[in-house]
């Protein structure tokens, strides 16, 4: 029997209400985290003898001593975790473990064309984390070449310390991936996504494109969007966002959606003709559902 302890907000077998998600933040602020987490777990759960347990984004959910005695490994799926506010407590937890630790799909949060010639605020924290993990495993999996280049500036080597593996969400369907080829017209069902990290022109462009398709939907992914949809609260952010209030037309027309689990999300996208926007996992979800997607890139 394989007993896997992993970093994540929920398991693929759990479903939480919108209210619970808002109060406990099991999505880690972004429901896109479900996607790569499900991809990792689907790859690991190869038989009925595999037991999985989430830490619900709480480093102290189980004490290190308990984890050492009751689990075979600690799996750490990550997104763009190498950033300025990188969490040091995860490093401390890993150092206390005696079981193997596996980092899968970690990425660097940076500008579109990052400058690696200058030190970054998170350098020391990232170096300590990667070193701690490598003491418990042979290698870590990173999302792309830019993350690899960043780790090289910290003294780590590709092939020895890390390997570029892409985003784990793309593993979810294995080789059985079929993308439909719809004929698009003004009546097509098109799903849009966007975020505040995208530039103002990008957000305006996405909003403009929505007007070209009457049967459009905007798919939210972050906690503030869920709070607006579920509670009617204004979207709280320091800069102007596309749909901040329930008085906006998209709310009034019932064209805004937020999905609290991956199956329902992909079911809705499978019934769509195209997904378009600046959210990586919002578009990957569409591809996994068999729907073509167009990603507007905003960073590395």
Where do the protein language model's features map onto the residues?
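Active-site anion-handling motifs in enzyme catalytic cores
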Residues: 1-300
């Amino acid at each position: 029997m394989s007993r896997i302890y992993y970093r994540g907000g929920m398991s693929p077998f759990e479903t939480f209400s919108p209210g619970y998600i808002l109060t406990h933040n099991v999505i880690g602020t972004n429901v896109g985290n479900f996607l790569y987490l499900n991809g990792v777990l689907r790859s690991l759960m190869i038989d009925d003898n595999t037991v999985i347990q989430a830490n619900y984004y709480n480093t102290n959910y189980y004490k290190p001593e308990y984890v050492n005695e009751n689990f075979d490994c600690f799996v750490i799926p990550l997104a763009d975790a190498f950033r300025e506010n990188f969490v040091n407590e995860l490093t401390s937890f890993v150092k206390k473990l005696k079981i193997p630790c596996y980092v899968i799909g970690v990425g660097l949060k940076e500008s579109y064309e990052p400058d690696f010639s200058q030190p970054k605020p998170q350098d020391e924290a990232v170096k300590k984390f990667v070193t701690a993990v490598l003491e418990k495993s042979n290698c870590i999996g990173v999302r792309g070449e830019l993350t690899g280049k960043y780790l090289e500036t910290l003294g780590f080597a590709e092939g020895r310390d890390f390997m570029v593996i892409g985003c784990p969400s793309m593993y979810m369907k294995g080789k059985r991936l079929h993308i439909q080829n719809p004929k698009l017209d003004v009546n097509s069902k098109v799903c849009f996504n966007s975020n505040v990290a995208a530039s103002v022109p990008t957000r305006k462009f996405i909003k403009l494109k929505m007007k070209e398709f009457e049967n459009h939907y905007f798919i939210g992914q972050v906690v503030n969007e869920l709070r607006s949809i579920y509670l009617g609260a204004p979207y709280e952010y320091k800069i102007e966002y596309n749909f901040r209030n329930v008085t906006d037309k998209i709310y009034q027309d019932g064209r805004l959606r937020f999905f609290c689990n991956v199956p329902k999300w992909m079911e809705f996208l499978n019934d769509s003709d195209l997904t378009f926007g600046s959210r990586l996992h919002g578009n990957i979800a569409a591809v996994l559902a068999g729907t073509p997607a167009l990603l507007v890139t905003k960073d590395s």
